[in-house]
Amino acid sequence: MDVPSSSNVTGRRKRQVLDDDEDDGFRSTPLRKVRGTKKIRPADVVPETIMTKIGAHIDDIVNKKKVGELNCFEYKSPLEIHTIEDMIKAKASIQEMAVVLEGAQCIIGYRVDRLHHDVRQIDSALSSGTVMRDSNGEEIHLTLESRKAKKKMAVVDGMNGMLDFLNNMDDALTTTELDADNDKNWKEDEENIAGEPRIDFKANSKDVDAFLQRDIFPEKLIYALSIKRATDLRADLLSDVSNYISADDTAHDLKDANIDWLRANPTFQKATKGSVCNSSNSFHSLNYYGIHSPDGRTLMLHNRIADKNADDRFFTSDVSVSLVKNTRALLTNSLDKKPRILDNYLMLEVKDRPVIGRYKIMSKDVKKSTLPLAESSREKDLANLTFAEMNHRPSNLDMTVAGASDMSMLPGNQGLPLAQGENDETIALDRLTPPLQSSVSQKASDEYVLPPLEANDLDEHLIGKLPIEPNEMDQTLANMFDKKLEVFNTSDTLESKVWKNGIRAEEWGEDDEAIMKNDTKHPRQAGIEGWIKATDAWTNYDVVKMNVNREARSQLDENAIDEQESYRNMVPEIGKNLFLVKSDDYMNNYPGDRPADFTVNDEVSDVMKMWSGEDSTAEDDVPLEQIQQEIREQVQQQDVDMEPIEEMDYDAGGAAFDVDFDDRLAAPVEVEEMEGDNNRNDGRVADILFNEQMDETEVEERNEQDVQRELEDIALAADEVAELMTSAPPPQLVGPSAEMREEIQNIGKNDNAHWVPPVVGDQERQAAVTAQRKRREKKAKSRKATVEDFVHYFRDIPDDEIEREITAAKCSKIADEKSTFLSEQQLYLPTLGIENKPHVAFEMGLLGNSGMFFKKSYGKIRLERVKNQKAEQDLFIDEARGNKDSDCLNWLLSFSGFRCMENPEPITGSDSDENLRTAVEQPFDDDFANDYYDEDRYDPNYEQQLAAAQMGPDMQRKLALTASHINQMFPNIHSKRYGGEYGDSDDEFDDSFDRQSIQAKNLDAAKHKKCLAEILKTDSLSMPSIQYVLEQLTSNQTLRMNNTTIRAADDRNETGRPATPTMEADKTLTSVFDYRSPNKSNHDVNETMKALTEMPDYQAADERPNNQPTTSTYGTANTENRKVHINGCHTLLSLALSMPSRMGETVRPSSIVSFLLHIANENNLQIVQDRSKRSWMSDFIVLNSSESLPRGLKMGRIEDQDEFWKRTQDPDAIEGTASDANNVFSNLMRRPKAVPVRKGRGAGGQPTTSDLGAIVEEEEMEE
């Protein structure tokens, strides 16, 4: 009995505990302090045995997930800590052994994955140009620098360095093999006694890795395998090196979580957005199909340099006699009617990688503890559940290394005894008869005699009979595995995996790549390429019209039948047909690569060296200026060498006829004239139209190189997509070329260009009448062109076009400009009439199945023809200047449908109309404008200035007043506070060409889209709510009624503000849309102002794992806002008012339009414009899908503006002329001019022209 302590005054007794100096193995477990005494029981003292140490180690590996690919070689395998013999002596149970094997499998799985990853990093490191080894040459792994490292090496130097590195590895391999042979010979001489090998009693104690090769540690094995793979790869590099490997560092610039597989997929070398821009965000539709070519414009898909060993699923060295015997013994027992109970028999269960195998502990499932194999054998083939088979399934390619002797690792004394012979490691079922307690005490060195073969007969229908001879056994088992693999490959599971997430991220199988190519071939050709070709053709081609009657149609049908084996020629329909002809004057204006992108880390790279190919003899000391001069001379020489194409001899066939087609788009003509056959006397069109010889009458063949050059200049590349992106802008010339200066001077004269003033339109109509009279006289003297003359247009269609036509149901309906016949409605806006023909207008809904805009069509977009800037190829790095519009957005903004006034800046000063009139500079005369554009410098934003200037003075005053109110409401929200969107600019137009350096900043797409989505979901930020607040602030009632803390205007402006809402204030947000809420009491000023001034903290919803890339802390750009439901009536102007304050930074209207189109595309939203107003392009409404217009919204009729459109000859033009273009716009926008203002410009007020005054009066009367 314990004696109470004398110091225990409370009567409590101390507990007796063991001293701290005692051995750890006898230390007691922690106990609760309770009253009274308690004796220590033997069960409380648990010594730390071998199995507890191993269990803790396995718990770190399996459950706590402390082991991964990075540290898998630092953690020891459980079998490396203690041998199986030690575990047997510690009386380990079969359950504990199962856990040990599971931990060993997990470690091996990570090591194999790390091995494959390191080997495949060899060729992926080629693109970065840097490959290094550890300072210690004996280290196993390669050290690969980050792909975002600086570029210090050209591609050729990187290739040579890589080959040298592999050669050194080959030398190390030879040395290792020689040393291994010497050690082996010495050991065999020592161990062989009387010609017989000595039995190794500890053969089973090594890690599973070691059973592939005896007497080799796992580290050496992994190193040897790496050397072997690298040697094979070196041979592939010498023979199959890709021509499209480039050294840029944008290989993994992917922003969509749905295509994360592309970052580490072993079948692609790299994937970029189609441009060598290092600072731009990419869009996944451009990245899906592969890498970019050296010129940066063409996305090309090609196979990665294949690791041939990656597809090896079966190693013959893994098949041994003991493995065959173990398999036979397990199958025999499991198929027996009364199988012997193998306590807690473990079945391999494949889980998610990188865990190769996981042993299922049957004892934890009481209901299935009896006869686990006998029950399952009645349902499915057990051959697929064997250890060997599970290690050779195609879905687990990395298991081959560990698949040699999994069964031989089972303990020999726990129901599965193993023989101790070096080549005989079989399971003896007869030895299961003794109870398990007696089997524990058996020695590991007991001899085992294989029972008679008759006792182990296998079910023939399962795997067939296995012969006794070892060689025949190996061959039979190999055939069995091959059959199982063939069945797996021919099943439907493979195809379903390919398209589960675009492409599965696991290791590719043998046929996966071919299946992917076959499935993506048709959508890629018919969808993307067709969309690009059709868009380019509809925008920039000339239109040729031809009537086809029944006789001509039947003749064409007969010709098609007489052609080759099948009806392969496409013929037009009966009636009027329109064809697109390539134009020499108007070509696609999609920007090419920007030379500034070749500047990395403020260091100009040598462009010639970067794409020098495989020629490693190029000089490294050639200055950049010399290379640029050589390029200029070559381009000039090519222009000189190009001989003009002579007109075709139409009289060669014996019959004289003229084809009278205009070289450019024809001027407006009468309707009856359009009904006839258009002819053309320019023979070059025949060659462009037919793309081949016409009746073999052309005198001289064109140079093939020149033809190829023209094709590259005309069309968009195959995989370039007109997608909205957020990247850097295209380069623009510092000064205009001769062609561009001539075009600027002759705007509205030579062609039916955009923004044609009424005066010029009258002159053009008069010229058109004269041209029509001349054409009639010429037609009367010549024979008209017939369908037979165009027979070469309906050529024999190549196979790739047939494939596109076959897959039309799955892909786009538009495949090729020469296999697509357009209707008149597709080319011309039906509301205008033929006489007021725009260049091209088409319905975006026709492209709905092309794969790009598959969720939402944005209505009609009118495309504008822009003359090709042939001097683009002369731009170099020192001439490039900053421009913050993105590539594709800039391309879309060149179309008039997206051309509107952006980012209006406030005009400070009095709000009265008289002061506003004096603050606006008066326009200058036309004569001065013509002289002004003769200078070497010009305004690159002339057309956008003209668009805003033609809004009219009344509209300008309204917008200026609104801007001043907004500036007074939010005095702290100014672009200077946030430093501008790009850090050094207060205005989006502050990108003058005379600025020396502008650092572009990537827009956070996810943040913008999330902010837009929240605004759209908030009714208090809708257009009526903001309009109501503006009205209250204007009448100065809000400060008195609600006692808000909004900062009031200055005293000098407060006196001039009217006491009641003015007409201009009412029109601030309703200049285009006339909307009045039925009940204004629903609008709360405090709530709206709080929402306007609130700056939410956009944080990520959940943390992403390290292996998943993300473009932003706010989520991914394309998956963040998939579900957006609009509350309220939101317009572009209301969004432009709300976003800057909530974002805490300057937001450009062009960015709002870009991201809003993305959200509309993802959520099937509507974008509505009121074209009855002349300023309809300055605003639009965003509505939910299938949602009707708001009740208080009044929409006009476009017919009310018919007279105005006819006078301007352009559906998108806005009132005004070119005479009041630049000064009004620059004052309204408050931006620095790109061109210095000449003295005297706007000094004297010029009266408005009579035509402009008439239009202004007409608008005032309407409103």
From Swiss-Prot:
Disulfide bonds: none annotated. Residues 1230-1241 have a biased composition (Basic residues). Keywords: Cell cycle, Cell division, Chromosome, Coiled coil, DNA condensation, Meiosis, Mitosis, Nucleus. It is found in: Nucleus; Chromosome. Residues 1-10, 1106-1118 have a biased composition (Polar residues). Residues 1-29, 1098-1118, 1225-1263 are annotated as: Disordered. This is Condensin complex subunit dpy-26. GO terms for biological process: cell division; chromosome condensation; dosage compensation by hypoactivation of X chromosome; meiotic chromosome segregation; meiotic sister chromatid segregation; mitotic sister chromatid segregation; negative regulation of gene expression. Required for both chromosome condensation and segregation and for X-chromosome dosage compensation depending on its binding partners. Member of the condensin I complex, a complex required for conversion of interphase chromatin into mitotic-like condense chromosomes and for proper chromosome segregation in mitosis and meiosis. As a member of the condensin I complex, further controls the crossover number and distribution in meiosis by restricting double strand break formation, probably by influencing higher-order chromosome structure. The gene is dpy-26. GO terms for cellular component: condensed nuclear chromosome; condensin complex; dosage compensation complex; nuclear chromosome; X chromosome. Residues 691-725 form a coiled coil. Expressed in embryos and in somatic and germline tissues in L4 stage larvae (at protein level). It comes from Caenorhabditis elegans. Disruption phenotype: Results in larval lethality in XX hermaphrodites; survivors exhibit shorter and stouter body morphology and are egg-laying defective. Male animals are viable. Higher percentage of spontaneous males through X chromosome non-disjunction. Disrupts protein stability of dpy-27. Disrupts localization of dpy-28 and of capg-1 to the hermaphrodite X-chromosome. RNAi-mediated knockdown results in chromosome segregation defects in mitosis and meiosis. In a sex-1 mutant background, leads to high embryonic lethality. Its main location: nucleus. Component of the condensin I complex, which contains the mix-1/SMC2 and smc-4/SMC4 heterodimer, and three non SMC subunits that probably regulate the complex: dpy-26, capg-1 and dpy-28. Within the complex, interacts with dpy-28, mix-1, smc-4 and capg-1. Component of the dosage compensation complex, which consists of the condensin I-like components mix-1/SMC2 and dpy-27/SMC4, and the three non SMC subunits dpy-26, capg-1 and dpy-28. Within the complex, interacts with dpy-27, dpy-28, mix-1 and capg-1. The interaction with dpy-27 is required for dpy-27 protein stability. Interacts with smcl-1.
